[in-house]
Structures are given as structure tokens and as C-alpha cells.
Amino acid sequence: MIIAEDALGDGADEKIPITLRGWVIWGVAALFYLYEFFVRVAPSAMAPELQETFKLSAAGLGAAIGTYYIIYSPSQLLAGSFLDRFGAKNILVPASLVCSLGCFLEVLGHDAFLLSAARFCQGLGSAFAFVGTMYLAAEWFPRSTLALLSGLTTSLGMAGAIIGNSGIAHIVEKLGWHASIIAAGVLGLVITALIYFVVPHKGRHHLEHATTVQSVRRPGIFSALRIVYSNPQSWLVGISGTALYMPLSILGALWGVEYISSVTGGNKVAAAGAVSMLYVGWLIGGPIAGWFSDRTGMRRNLLLGAGVATFITTLVVVCIHSLSVKGAYVLMLLMGFASTSQVVCFATAVEHNPKSVSGTAIAATNMMIMFLGGAGEWMFGVLLDHFSGGGVHDSYPAQAYHKAILLLPAISAIGLVAAFFLTEPSRKKLVLPADAALRVESVVWPKISLSRWLHWLRRWYPGKKDNPC
């Protein structure tokens, strides 16, 4: 994909003017990213309603909601290749449509399989949102603005998460969860139409500058994955990043509203507002962490410091059994700010691997983080069921939440150990800056040509002339 390193030459980059049309095209795609983040975290504001409707235990709900990540994680690995081959419009339109149709599917019945299928569709469509947005940014803007556009795109994603928590809680309280999800589906159809009418079939300078990527010989998909995953540092980066992301996944995406309501005694709207502070912390801290890491050259030490801060804040959450709503706001903000240095792990993964697999390193790291994040939601639900006696509950006792939340500091401790054994990567080669790599989910994937497949087939299944039998 053309947002990779060396994809655009510096001289050619200066010829790309910033136009109003470019801003509109990027803005429509970024709106899809805001929407998918909203859909991703919306279940946290309606967890009891979903459990009651689909007759699910906490573990069952966690597994059904986590289906989103199961398809999202591997799909984003291929997003770059699909965009390169078919173009942004031909990918983003069906992706947005599938994501919105997943919302309508969610309200069609009361079967748990239906909920899983709906989340599967939402995750499949969402996998292309951020990558497609940055693809268009690289097509319509100078390379020197990509870090800014990456930060702005991520900020919109965090805004979608805030709306998906506190905003939808008001709607659910007044109209019910069915109406809220239907409204989300209609909004998705509107965004699909906007993408169809606004985004062009071909980028302005795609034909001029995309050839640079193809001129560089890169390993095949499976070879690149083998290079990345055979590197112990890649696993340490992924584990450290997962530990920093886990509070956002467990509390931000699913269980936070019910947990805070339980420990504070506040209503769901107030609890959703507190959970939104997690995303505000990321919104503020992400660009700062990326800028500081690039400025000082720190990768390993910043991840280690973030691991310590996250472990302390999660430990505070465990130790405090009685908390006011205002206290929950402050604690969630601090936890979000502490864990936001997770954005640095993408640049760290790039620097710990050969330049030829930089895109693979970013995508593979993100796949690990998102997959394990979904598993974390399920594990929390299992613990919640165990400590509350099992079965389906309208609400879980505060004591069960206090015990289940021990999962967070335990995972933080594992991430802290992983960060400790990380080495500071070499800064000699050209890499993506940390803030530009924020939430980058796929960069470059080489295409496997038909001739290569035929070559493999001839090698393993020779013809009669070469077969002594």
C-alpha cells in the first residue's frame, strides 16, 4: 500500500497540492472510521439488555461480542493488498455496507448465533476503515502531512468511542437498545452513500507513484509473517502492547459501564461518561506519547514506563471497593493516559524487524493486540460468571466485579515483564514515526501472482516426464 516507507518520493511529494476536494474525500472516509469505532464499543452501554434478549451469561456475551475481533484481526492483514488491487472506493463501499447491515442483523431475533453473526459482519467491515482512510490520505495529500492526518483520524476514532459509550447510553435509556442499533444501521447506510458519491474510483496520483512499491522486491505474505513471528522481540512488543490495550478492551468496549455502575452506585449514563474518560485519556496522551518517543528516541523505556503506570492504576482499581462517580472519572482518565503509550509499539515492531517487512510487522502486531483484546473480554466474562455462581444474571454483584477485575493488573504485570525484556531498537533505518503509526493496521502486502502459484504447483506436483513412476 502506498503509505509505506519510500512509497512516495520526496520530489514528487512536493508537487501534491492540498485541496478542498482532498479534505472532503479524506473526511468522508474518516467518518467511516468514527462510525466503526462507535459500533465497536456500543455494546458496553447495553450489556444487560443484550444478555436479557439473547439469554446469555457474562461469558457467553463476551464470546459473542468478541466475534468482532476474531474476524477483524486477520482481515486487516489483507486490507492493504485489497486496497492496492481494487481501489479505495471499491473496498470502502462494501465494507461500510457490511458493517451497517451487521447492525440490522443484530435486532432481527433473539438467538445468540444471530448476535455473533452480526458482530462478525461489523468486524469484517470495520477492518478496512482506518487503512482505507490513510490510503486516501496518501493519495490526496503530501507525505509530510500523513502524521497529522493519522492523528486526526485516530482522534475521530476516539470521538466515536466516546459517543458509543456515553452518547448511546442516553439513547438506550430513552428509546431502548433496539432503536439505538437500528439508528446506527441507518447512519451506516448514509455513510455508505457518502463514500459512493464522494470517493473517486482512482486516486489523483496513484498511477504515478504506486510503481515505487512494486519495484521493491519484498517477501511473500507467509514468508513475511514467518520473519516477524520468528523474532522474539516481535512477541515481546505484541504482549506489551496487548497489556496496555487491555483496559480499553475490557472496560471501554464491554464491561466498564456495568462495573462502574456496580462499584459507584451511579446510573448507567454517569457510568458511561466515566468510561468515556478512558478514550479521552488516549485522545490526549496518544499524540504526546508519539511525539515524545520520536523526539527522545525512546521505545522500550517508554513502553516500560507505561507498563508500570498501567499496572499501578489497575491495582488502584482493584484496591478501591467504594468509589464516587467523580472518582471514577478521574481514575478512568488516568488509566487511559497511562496506557496510551501503546501507540509506540507499532514503531517499535517496525524497528525490530527488517525494513522489507515493516508493513507486516505493524499489521501482525496489531492483529495480536486485537485478537488478544477480544479474548480478554471473554476471560473477564468467564471470571464474572464464576464469582457470581454462574448462569444468566440481570446484574452482577459488586463483589463479583471486584474479583474479576483482578484480571487487569495480572495482564499488566505480564506486559510489564515483556517490556522489561525488550531491547531498545536501532534507529538507523527509515521507519514510520510513532505518532504516524498510531493505529496503523496494514501498510504493504505483496501480491501473490498466478505464475508463482503455478511454479509452486510444478515443484510439488511434477508432470509425467519428471516422474519416474
List PLM regions with ranges:
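Helix-breaking motifs and short loop linkers at transmembrane-helix boundaries and internal kinks
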Residues: 55, 87, 108-114, 142, ...
